[in-house]
Swiss-Prot record:
A lipid is attached at C16 (S-diacylglycerol cysteine). It comes from Bradyrhizobium diazoefficiens (strain JCM 10833 / BCRC 13528 / IAM 13628 / NBRC 14792 / USDA 110). Belongs to the FlgH family. PROSITE patterns: PROKAR_LIPOPROTEIN (PS51257). It is found in: Cell outer membrane; Bacterial flagellum basal body. The gene is flgH2. One of its GO terms (molecular function) is cytoskeletal motor activity. The basal body constitutes a major portion of the flagellar organelle and consists of four rings (L,P,S, and M) mounted on a central rod. Residues 1-15 form the signal peptide. It comes from the Bacteria. This is Flagellar L-ring protein 2. The keyword Membrane applies.
Length: 231
């Protein structure tokens, strides 16, 4: 009984291999390049050189009359169009069975100094193992929305890193949309928009915070138990 009391805490500690924080906050996105930071940094802006303006003139020499409106510099804004219609259905079944049997027999006859003895020995050994597994996934996603993102950095090859977020609050429910990734200037359309499937290392997160989200999630005590339970 004492050994059982000592073994139970050790078994519970084996469930601590994962990150317990995920049980409270949910899965976290992997970083893009330098990473998507939880705290918003100051938006980088390329300083613009001011040119002298002639007084009593309606023309400003610093005006970009023929400049392409597409985002190309740090601090520019580009609109990301997200139109996702994905369906996935997986059905996996695995089975394994093994049966082995060993039979051993021995007969002997012995006569020593007039004393006779004979006998028979038989030994049987058999094993049987069987494993079956079944898994099924049926998922359907339909998301259509757009979000404005800011160019946070321009890579040496000309590609740009973008990051954007939106927050919608309805009563006590907050909806948060985050998007980030790396885009090529050539993939940006003339209307300064880009489709999400042309974003490399795309990170799209859409979730909520509030009373409704709290009701849909299990309690924090249950989540902690699931994080440390070894079974």
């Amino acid at each position: 009984m004492k050994n059982l009391i000592l073994i139970l805490p050790l078994l519970m500690l084996t469930g601590c291999v994962g990150d317990p924080a995920d049980a409270l906050t949910g899965p976290r996105l992997s970083p893009v390049g330098s990473g998507l930071r939880t705290q918003a940094d100051p938006i980088p802006v390329t300083p613009r050189m001011r040119t002298p303006v002639s007084y009593r003139s309606t023309w400003d020499d610093g005006t970009d009359l023929y400049r392409d409106p597409r985002a190309r510099r740090t601090g520019d804004v580009v609109t990301v169009i997200i139109s996702m219609q994905d369906k996935a259905k997986l059905d996996n079944k695995t089975g394994r069975s093994r049966d082995s049997q060993i039979k051993f027999g021995l007969d002997w006859l012995m006569d020593v100094a007039g004393w006779a003895d004979k006998g028979q020995t038989t030994a049987n050994l058999s094993t049987n193992t069987q494993i079956k597994g079944n898994g099924q996934i049926d998922r359907t996603e339909d998301i259509k929305l757009s979000i404005a993102a800011i160019v946070t950095d321009v890579l040496p090859n000309g590609n740009m890193m973008i990051s954007g977020s939106q927050e919608f609050r309805v009563n006590t429910e907050m909806r948060v949309l985050n998007v980030g990734g790396i885009v090529r200037p050539r993939d940006i359309s003339r209307t300064n928009t880009i489709s999400y499937e042309k974003i490399a290392e795309a990170r799209v997160s859409y979730g909520g915070q509030g009373n409704l989200s709290d009701v849909q999630q299990p309690g924090w005590g249950h989540r902690i138990y699931d994080a440390v339970a070894p079974f």
